[in-house]
Every structure is written in structure tokens, then in C-alpha cells.
């Protein structure tokens, strides 16, 4: 099925914990993830790396990609569509670039290796670009751009996914959620942008499906090409690979810029599967694993001037945006990454909200693996 496609909260806004959630200490949750991945058969440091990506999603409030994803990975490891013992391999390399084959290893491990390689190259030459083919779902795109930011570098991270987005004027899903992440050093928080190029992701459709509520108009079109707010119908048809799908960022047609989201999604596809010579969308449905491709680029702002000066300029600009005139009834203007970093501060202190359904899944995984639960 296609349940595993990257999904994000609306506008990448951290979900506020509700009374239905249990707060689990970040330390406890991380320790559980590490135990689980070691028991699945990963080496200790690999288990810690996978846990770090999932924890970052939960801390930033992008819960569709945290503990909630563990059951999906657990099933894929059992099915063999994630290869436990594979290691990503460098196929071609120059001082500023590399092409890697993931051999269907856990996407988080391959992606972290590819971004580390880009970071090393950027430190030596000023710039590093790596592309990956034959990978699997890698979690949140923004994790990898943040890795570079922590080293004082600016960075891009992108991935393709299975077909879910229809082209402008089309009714057949030909593109993925194709997220695009960019991070630039700044204070007190980096500029951390991570967004799908679809209006919404499958996750949002799933939420409306579970709640039995109609979706807002303008998210999806059905097999006839008509706008559709019936979540159960669209959820089923996307999972079946029927005609219809989620609209590009900007929505239907060209009036509100839908062709721009469509163009951005093709750009991500060009930089991932085309450049890495991996599987392009329509081919991704059948065969082994995910056939996901990724793109990473890290560069050193110091190539262009004093890095602390550039960082200060970025910080000042973001502050000016936050200080600018608000519309009536809105107390704050946020900059990308601000809500995520505020969520992280809260969750490190007060624990990570975990939904009851997810807690039940974690208990099931613990029982199956014979490890201590959360």
C-alpha cells in the first residue's frame, strides 16, 4: 500500500498536545526507540541514528513522522522491503559530489550518510552535493538540512515518494509529496523550512478519514477530475492507485498558482530520481521496496563573506519579519522553524505528547520484539 508516504501537519505547524495524549519523557521515548531498533537487528549506532531522526520529528511537533511511523517501519522490516544489513555505497564521486546507491537500507541511515558526505565536502571545498537512489522513506526532509546547519552550513534536502499528486489539468497521480527543505544558520533559531509541494499530504486526508469529517474543498480531485471533499473515498482511492489524487501546492488549475506547486514538484523529481537515475514515480508502485531517491546539498556561507556577518543579517531579517505589522486578531508572525523550536523546548521539558493509538502500536512492537515498553 501507499500508507507510508511522507505526511506533514498542516502548514508544518506542530500539533498541540490534547487531553487524549499521554506525555512521555523525551529520554524514555528515545531509549525505547533505540531498544526497538537494536532488537530489530540494527547495530547500536545505527539504531541511535534512526531514533534521532524520529525523535527530531516528535520534538518539532511533526508527529506523523515520529513514534507514529514506527509501526510502518516495523512492518516493512518484517516484509523485507527495508534491507537490514545493506549499506549505502558510493557509486561515483568528485571533490564536490557523490552518487550513492542505498541498496534499500533504512532511508534514515542512507540519508544521514549522504548528508555527512555533503557536509565533509562543503567543509573542504565550500560545497557538497550528493544524490541517492534505491533508498527508502527517510523521515522528515528537514532533519538532514538541520545536520548541516549545526555545522554552520546552509543546506537543502529533498526526496521523491510514490505517486500521489496530480499534474495541473491532470487527473492521474504522477508526482509524490516531494518535500523541499532548506536551512540557513540564524539566531535564536535557524531559518528551518520543510514543506511538501502538495497542498496537503496523505496524512491530512487520513486524519479527516479517521474523524469522518468532510475535507476542505480544494485539497483533492477524484477520478473524474472533480474537486472532492469525501475523505474516506479519496483515502481509499489514493491507496488503491486509482485515478484522482492530491492537488499541487496552490490548488486546482492556474488561478491560485497550482502550476507553481506542480513545477516545484517536478524540480524535486529532477534533482532526485532523474539525477540519481533512480525510479521515477509511475514506476515506483511495483517491485522491491520504495525505490526512493534523495538530494542533499550543503554549502559554506563563508565562500561569500564573513559567516558571522551573514548569520547576523539573516537573524536581523527574520526578526524584522516577526516584528512587522500583524493583521487584527493575530498576536504573532512566525518565521519557518520558530514553532518547531518552541515545540522542542516544551517537549524536552514536559514530555512528548503521544496519541493513544500510537502508544498501543508501541506496546504491540515491544511485545513482538520482547523488549521493555515505553
What are the language-model segments listed below?
Residues 23-24, 29, 270, 275, ...:
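Catalytic-core signal marking the mid-to-C-terminal active-site face
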Residues 100-102, 129-134, 155-159, 184, ...:
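General beta-strand structural signal in soluble alpha/beta enzymes
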Residues 1-19:
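Short, Lys/Arg-enriched N-terminal segments with co-localized hydrophobic residues
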Residues 66-119:
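Active-site cofactor/substrate anionic-group-binding motifs, chiefly glycine-
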Residues 214-283:
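Secondary-shell segments that build the walls of catalytic and ion/ligand-binding clefts
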Residues 165-239:
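Phosphate/diphosphate-binding glycine-rich loops and adjacent basic-rich segments that engage nucleotide
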Residues 112, 116, 120-160:
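A glycine-rich phosphate/pyrophosphate-binding beta-strand-loop-alpha-helix module
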Amino acid at each position: 500500500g501507499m500508507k507510508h508516504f511522507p505526511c506533514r501537519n498542516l502548514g508544518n505547524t506542530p500539533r498541540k498536545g490534547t487531553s487524549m495524549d499521554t506525555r512521555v519523557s523525551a529520554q524514555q521515548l528515545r531509549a525505547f526507540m533505540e531498544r526497538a531498533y537494536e532488537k530489530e537487528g540494527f547495530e547500536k549506532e545505527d539504531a541511535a541514528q534512526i531514533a534521532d531522526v524520529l525523535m527530531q520529528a516528535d520534538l518539532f511537533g511533526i508527529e506523523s513522522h515520529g513514534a507514529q511511523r514506527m509501526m510502518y517501519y516495523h512492518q516493512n522490516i518484517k516484509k523485507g522491503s527495508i534491507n537490514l544489513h545493506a549499506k549505502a555505497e558510493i557509486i561515483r564521486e568528485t571533490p564536490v559530489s557523490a552518487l550513492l546507491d542505498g541498496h534499500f537500507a533504512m532511508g534514515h541511515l542512507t540519508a544521514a550518510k549522504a548528508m555527512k558526505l555533503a557536509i565533509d565536502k562543503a567543509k573542504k571545498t565550500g560545497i557538497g552535493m550528493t544524490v541517492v537512489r534505491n533508498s527508502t522513506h527517510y523521515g522528515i526532509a528537514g532533519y538532514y538540512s538541520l545536520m548541516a546547519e549545526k555545522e554552520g552550513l546552509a543546506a537543502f534536502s529533498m526526496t521523491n515518494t510514490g505517486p500521489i499528486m496530480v499534474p495541473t489539468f491532470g487527473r492521474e497521480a504522477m508526482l509524490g509529496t516531494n518535500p523541499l527543505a532548506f536551512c540557513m544558520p540564524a539566531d535564536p533559531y535557524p531559518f528551518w523550512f520543510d514543506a511538501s509541494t502538495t497542498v496537503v499530504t496523505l496524512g491530512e486526508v487520513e486524519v479527516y478519514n479517521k474523524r469522518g469529517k468532510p475535507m476542505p474543498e480544494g485539497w483533492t480531485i477524484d477520478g473524474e477530475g472533480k474537486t472532492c471533499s469525501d475523505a474516506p473515498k479519496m483515502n481509499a482511492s489514493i491507496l488503491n492507485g486509482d485515478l484522482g489524487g492530491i492537488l499541487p501546492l496552490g490548488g486546482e488549475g492556474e488561478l491560485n498558482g497550482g502550476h507553481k506547486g506542480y513545477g516545484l514538484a517536478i524540480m524535486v523529481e529532477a534533482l532526485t530520481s532523474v539525477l540519481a537515475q533512480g525510479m521515477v514515480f509511475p514506476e515506483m508502485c511495483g517491485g522491491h521496496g520504495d525505490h526512493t531517491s534523495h538530494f542533499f546539498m550543503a554549502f559554506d556561507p563563508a565562500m561569500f563573506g564573513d559567516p558571522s556577518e551573514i548569520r547576523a543579517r539573516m537573524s536581523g531579517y527574520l526578526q524584522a519579519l516577526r516584528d512587522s505589522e500583524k493583521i487584527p486578531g493575530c498576536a504573532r508572525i512566525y518565521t519557518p522553524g520558530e514553532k518547531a523550536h518552541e515545540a522542542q523546548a516544551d517537549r524536552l521539558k514536559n514530555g512528548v505528547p503521544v496519541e493513544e493509538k500510537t502508544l498501543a502500536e508501541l506496546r504491540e512492537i515491544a511485545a513482538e520484539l520482547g523488549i521493555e515498553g515505553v
